[in-house]
Swiss-Prot record:
It comes from the Eukaryota. GO terms for biological process: protein localization to plasma membrane. Residues 486-508, 806-847, 872-951, 1008-1160 are annotated as: Disordered. PANTHER family: PROTEIN EFR3. Disulfide bonds: none annotated. Residues 487-498, 819-837, 872-888, 898-909, 934-944, 1049-1062 have a biased composition (Polar residues). This is Protein EFR3.
Amino acid sequence: MNAIQQKCRPKHQVLVLKCYPRTTKGAVDVKPNSSELSYLLYYAASRKSKFQKVGSFLEKKTASDVWRLRIGNVQVTLQILEALIEKNPKDLPLFAPSVLKILDLVLKSNDITMVESSTPTFEAFCANHDASSLFADQAYLKQYESIVRQYASLASTRRSPGKTTPSKPVAMRWRNTGLEAIRSVASSDALASVQGTQYDILVPMILENLWTDNEEFLEILLHRAHLEEKVDTDKLLLRRRTSVATVRTAEGGNEPNPIALSGSAMDVDKLAEEDIGVLAITCLKQIFVGPNRSQIHAATVALLKFIEERVNQDENVVKKSARTGRDSGWAIKIFGLISRWAPVQERYVILMTTMDTLVRMPLSDESMRHHIVWMAMMGALLRSDVNLIGLSVMDVLLALMQHMKRLVQLPGDPSGASASDMLLPGQPDPRSPTTIAASTAAQATAAARKELLERIQQTIGDLATHVYYADQISDMISAIIQRLRPSKSNSPGNTSPQGEKIDGQVASPEDSTVESLFSLTVAKVAALKAIKTILLVANPRTKMAGNLGLARNKVSISVWEGTQWLLRDPEGLVRKAYADAVITWLDRETVKGDLKAVDESAPNPRASIRYTRDLGKMDVSPARRAASSASTRREPKPTRLHFLNLIHVAIYDNALQYVDYETDINLLHVLLAKLVDRLGINAVRYGLPMIFRLQEDIQEVDAPIGKVRVGCLVHGYLWALTEKFDFENTLVGRAIHNEIIRRRSKHFWIEGVHVPPPLLELIGTPGMVKPQPKMPLNQIESEALLPFDDRFALIDSICTGYQESFASPPTSPAASPGRSFTSPILGSQMSGLSPHTATDDEREVPSRFRDQMYVEWTRDLVIAMVQAGSKSASLNGSKTGTTGTSRYANARLGGNTGSPMASQQNLRPYSQPAGKDTLAPQNNPLAKLRKSSLRSNATPSPASSGPIRSGVTSVDQLKMVLSGQVAPAVVRAQTSHGNGAGGLGADDSTDSLVSYDMTVSEMSFNAGSVTYTPSHPVPRPPSRSRSHSRERRAASRSGAESPGGFDQLSRSNSFGKSNGNGRTIEDGRHDRHDDDGVPPVPPLPSGVSSPPLPPSRDGKSPSPRSPSTQAPVLPPVSLESSAIRPAKTRSLKSRGRHSRSGSIPSAPAPHAMRPATSAGHGVVGGDSAFDLDALLLGIDTKDMQGTLGNVTRPVY
C-alpha cells in the first residue's frame, strides 16, 4: 500500500518528501538532503504554479510534525522555505501566505528549539518581502501583523510563553529569539510602509531589554555594539578579498569567551545579559537610522509612551545631580542616542514630536511628573552637541510659552511658594496627621510646579545653544518681550512711559489672553529669566565646537524698545528680573565698538555714495532713473530708538518712589553703572542730565535717610563716570571722590553703592524692607549733603576721556598733529585748511551729545519729546520746529526757577551752576530751536528777551553793519518787530544766522572775570553782585523798555537764592554760552558810531548805552555757521595759550561796567560814543592765522 501511495502522489510532494533525511524522533539540528533540495528548487522555479502547491503541502506536513513534536522535520521544513525564498525572491508573493501560516504554527508550539530554528526563515522572508503586497489583501496584512506581534512578545522581560515559568537561561533564549526577529523586521522595507508600521509593538520590547538603573551598563553595551559593527565590517571586507579557490577550515570569529569558560554561573548570566543588550541596541539603532520621517516620528511616539508607563510605575527615569545640577538618567541617555542615530536632516522630528506630545497631554498636578521628565529630555537634547538642522526654533519657543501659560493657569499658587499652614486661631493643629498630610501634599505640588516652571525657562534658553540663522537670538527675545507687553485695555496703572503706545500695535484677541496671563508676577519673572538664560547660553564663556563655524547677529538695543515699564512694576521680583536681563544683555552682547558715540541723526555719507554708484550701474534712461530709482534703491530712514531715554526716566521715577527701600537704590545703581560701563557716552548723554535733576530733587525727599540714599545714587553714578572716563585724578574727579569719602566717613552712605558695582545676586529683593543701618540721623538733619554742581567741567572731562579712550598712537612723530589751531572752529570751505583729520573728527564727541548733556532735564519733557519725536523731533531740534521741540520750549520757559540747588557759586569748592533753570537760553541748545510763526506771540521770556534775539537777523542788515552804512543799534531797533527798541516782547522771527554766544570754557578760563579756586571757598561781599554778562544784558535791556518790561525782566531773573546753608548765592548761569564756533569780530570803519536810538512806542526816549552794552558787532558768516547745524562746543584741552576770551566785548573794557541797582534792573550809564579802540584792542588777531584773513565766505 505504501508503494502504491507513493506512486499516486504528485511529483512536487514526492520531491519535498525526499528532502527529509531519515532521523529518530526528537533529533535536532537536522538538515535537508542537499541534492533533493536542489532538484526541488529547480522544479519549482521551472514551473511557477508549483510554488503554491509546495507551500500548501508544507503547511499540512508542518502541522503534523508540530503536533507530534518532530523537531527535526520542522527544522527541515523551515530550511526548505528559506531556500525557496532566497532562490526565487520575486516569486515570494505566490507562497508568502503559506510561509506565514507555517511560522504561526511554529510560534504556537511554545517550543524554544523550533522557534529558534524559525528565525533564519523569518529573516529571509523580511529581507525579500515586498511591502506593496500589504496594500492589496487585508487578510494577509492581519496575518503579517500577528506574526510580528508574536515574535515581538517573545522579547518581553515580564512574561514568557508557555504555562510554566522558564528558567533564567531559557528565558534569555526566548528574549534573544524575539530580538532577532525584531531586528529582521526593523531592517525590512515593510516596516517603513504605512500599513506595516508595528512600532508600538517593537519599540517597547526593545526598550524593555535596555531598561536599567545603571547608566554605565548602557555605556558598556554601546562600546560592545560598536566593536561588533567594526568586526562585521572587517569580515565583509575579508570575504570580498578571498579567492574562490581558497578553502577556509576555521572561523576565527566564533572563539569562546574566556569569561564564559572560567567564570561562575552569575558571570555567565551577566555576559548573556550583555549579549541581549547589544542585540537590543542594534535593533533600536536599526529603526532610527532609516531616512524616513514618518518612521522616526512613530518610533519616537512609542518611546515616549514607554517612558510614560515607566513614570506611572514610579520608576526614576531622570535624575538631577545635586552637585552640578545637570540632568541625567536612562530616558535622557536613550533620547540622546536615538537623536545621534537619526539622519541629520530628520533629527528635528524627534524634538518636534516630543513637543507635540507635551502640549497635547493634559497639564494637572497628577501629570506633573510626566511634563517634568519630557521637559528635561528636551532640554538635554537642545543643550547637547547634536545639531538639529531644520528645527523651527520659533515654533518650539511659542509652544513653550504656551505651556508656561497653561502652567500659570492652574488653580492655586503658580509660583510654587511654600504651602505650609500657619497657626491661626480656630484652625486644626498642623501637627495632626490630617493637616500634616495635606501640608505635605501641597508642598510637593508647589515644588513640582516650581520645578516645571524652572525647566520651561531653562529649555527656552537651551534653544539658543545652536544658531540656525543670523537673527535667531534677537527674534527669540523679541517674541518673549512681545508677550510680556500688556494690552492697552489692561496696562498697568503706573506713571512710567509705555513703549507700546509709541509702537501703535493692536493686539489680537489671542494675544490679549496671553498678555492677561503674563500680567502675573510669576509669569513675568519666568519670562525675564528665560531671556537671561537665552543670553547666557548664546554667549558661553567657552565656545562649543558646534558653534565655532556659525555666525549670528548681535542682539541690538532695539529689542528692548518699549520695555522700560517693567522696571516700574510694583513687584520687586519683576524689577530685579528685568534689571538682571538687561545687565546680562549689556555684559554678553555689547562689544567695545558700542562705546563709540553713535549719532543717529547724522547723515550717512556711505549710503549716498553707494546710492550714486548703484545708480551709475543701472542701464536705463535718465528719466526712468529719476522716476524709479529713488523709490527702489534708496535706503530707508533708520528707526529712532528711545529705550535709553525712557529707561532713565524709569530709573528716575523708581529712585523717588522706592526711596524707602535700600535694595531698590542698589539695584538702580548697578543698572546705571552697567549702562555707563558698557555703552559709555551713548548712555551718559541721557543719564547725566537725569542725575543732575535727581540731585536737585533730593530737597523734595522728606525722610533724612531717603536724602542719603538718593544722594548715594547720584554720587555713585558720578563715581562710575570717573572710573569709566578715567578722570578721577583731575580736579572734578577729586571733588567727587572727596565728597564720597566725606559721606562714607560720616556714615552718610549705604552699602552696595560702589564701583565696580556688586553682583545682582547679592542684592536682596527690591521692595523688601531691610534692617535700618546705623546712621547718625541727627547729623543728617543738621549737616547738609553737598551736591556736585560743576556740571560744565564734568562734561568737558567726560568728552576728554572719551577722546583719549579712542586715541590711537601716531604712525610717526612727523605725522603727529600740532597744537596750533589756526583755523576757526566753524571752518572755512574756501580755505580748505582743517587742523583735524577724519580720525580726529570720529574721536570727537558729537555736538549733539554735548548739547544733550547740557540740557536741563525734566521727566515730562522727555515723555512729551518721545511721543512727538517718533516722527521728526529730536533733542537737538529740527529746521522747521516740531511738536516735541515746541513742548520742550513751553516746559523749559515755564519751569520752576526757585530750585534751592540752582547756584552759580555756593561757597564750596568746584562750584558750578546745576539748578533747574539756571542754564541760560543761549547756553541751552534746545531753547534756541527755530520757532515757527505759530509761536510768534508767545509770552516774553528770558529766551526771547536777551541780546541774542534782538541782534541782526538778515543778510542785508549784516552787510550794512559790516560795511559801516548803519550802526548796530539802528539795526537792532529796526528788527524789534513791533516791540520797540528794547525788544522785550516776543520775537516772531527765526534764529539769527549768526548769534554772538560765548562758550562755557571761555567764561571759565577768563582770568578777568572768573576765578576758579578748587580748594577754598570763594569769599563773597555782603551785597549781591552780578556777573559782567548779566550787567551787559541788563544794560542792553534798559535802553528801551515797554510798560511790562520790568515785570517780565524781574520774572526772568531771580536772585537771592539760598544754597541750603543760609547763605545767599546768585543764579548766574546766564553768563554761559554754548556757541563756541564764532570767529573773531572784524574791524569796523573808524568813523562808525552809534546814533541815538529812536523813541519807543510809548514816546519815551531810551537811555543811552555804555560801550560795553552795545549790541555786539557780528563777524562774517560762513556756510558752516548757519543755524541749520548745531553749534560745536570746544573742549577745554584743545585750547592753546591764546584764547578767544580776550575777544569778548567785556574783556577790553571791564571798567565800563556799572554796578546794578538793588533790584537787579537798574539803568547802566555810559558814554554814548562807540569806543572802537577798546573793542579792537580786545580782538585776538592770532586766532585767525593760517586762514584767508578776516574775510570768510558769506552765506549769500
